[in-house]
A protein has these predicted regions:
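SAM-dependent methyltransferase catalytic region
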Residues: 1-350
Length: 350
């Protein structure tokens, strides 16, 4: 689908002496209705509600719509009181449980899924929320790293000639400077393909989002490998592989003072990452390529079975995460100007 898209665009823009346009970083494919977003829940929406005898009861976050995060020019605009929605399981996951015929044939697996699902949606306590804060902060680190790499790649793969204004930009301080021009289309493709490296921020973030999506489609045959909520968080944190020292100072202080509830009872400037913590510095071509070959695999030994299941389901259902795939569009422009969709149609009546 991507190759056909490239060909169609080439045929529509081709002209004499033009440089071969590079569309790989503009086109992607997947199931647009199955994916995760860069959206968050506030603490009040997920933290357990005090019931009788001060016992924490469920705060049904899955019945609320998460809020989309915003971006400043050089940072994710997320409060320490907000955690990413794809870190939290949903009461409607494990959809296979609703198929009556399969339920009867897989009674033991069904019972295990039911037990696991109940534990997934248990109340969130202080320790749980601190874990969610820490993981969310690590996701921010990788989002910034991925965005930096993406705009760097965009810079190096842009066509070196402007068509419309007829101005030679080679002498200006822009993306068209001579030393930044790519030697060949193959070189551009090589740079872009670094995003699929095992240790690349994009690859890690996509696998985390795929993991959340996979829990909706988990099959009875794999019921024995379903993670508990704590195992799910542990798997994600291991995937991200971000040292605690790299998370922003605001979150570090919040985690250190997790016992001081007053810190989380309100939101102010202190709860958001500062400009000094989040400067964007573009990467050179050499840095991009070197980092891509730093690690062949995320894991020292064989890839965990649960993640093999996640990758199998992702390949089958083509999970698609729009804000991740087009992060520079959402970061710099807050989304697309126009979105064209396929059926089902809504028939207008007058």
């Amino acid at each position: 689908a991507i190759e056909l898209g490239k060909l169609s665009l080439w045929l529509n823009v081709i002209h004499k002496d033009m440089e071969t346009p590079f569309f790989a970083n503009r086109l992607t494919v997947g199931n647009a209705v199955i994916g995760a977003w860069l959206k968050v829940y506030n603490k009040d929406e997920v933290y357990g509600i005090k019931g009788r005898n001060n016992k924490l009861e469920q705060n049904k976050w899955w019945e609320r719509a998460p809020h989309r995060i915003k971006f400043y020019s050089n940072r994710v605009n997320r409060s320490i009181n907000e955690v990413y929605h794809f870190l939290l399981p949903d009461n409607n996951m494990l959809g296979v449980r609703s198929i009556t015929e399969q339920k009867k044939a897989n009674k033991e697996a069904y019972d295990r899924m039911t037990t696991i699902l109940k534990s997934w949606t248990a109340s969130i306590n202080a320790a749980d929320f601190a874990t969610l804060q820490r993981i969310s902060a690590k996701i921010d680190v990788l989002l910034k790293d991925y965005f930096t790499a993406q705009i760097s790649i965009d810079k190096y793969t842009n066509n070196r000639k402007e068509i419309w204004d007829g101005i030679d930009h080679a002498e200006s301080d822009s993306i068209f400077k001579e030393e930044e021009r790519m030697e060949s289309y193959a070189r551009k493709q090589q740079l872009f393909d670094t995003r699929y490296g095992h240790d690349n921020a994009y690859h890690k973030l996509k696998l985390v989002m795929d993991y959340w999506c996979a829990l909706w489609f988990w099959e009875y045959k794999d019921a024995g490998d379903l993670p508990t909520r704590e195992e799910y968080w542990g798997d994600i944190e291991a995937l991200l592989a971000v040292d605690n020292s790299k998370i922003d100072s605001r979150t570090q202080q919040a985690l250190e003072r997790a016992g001081a509830s007053s810190l989380f009872d309100h939101e102010d400037d202190f709860s958001r990452i500062s400009e000094d913590d989040a400067q964007i510095v573009l990467k050179t071509q050499k840095e991009i390529l070197t980092e891509a070959h730093a690690n062949i695999s995320l894991f020292a030994n064989e890839e965990p079975l649960r993640l093999q299941i996640v990758e199998r389901l992702a390949e089958r259902y083509h999970f698609f995460h729009p804000m991740l795939e087009f992060i520079e569009v959402f970061w710099l422009r807050d989304g697309f100007d126009v979105i064209c969709g396929n059926p089902p149609w809504l028939k207008y009546t007058f």
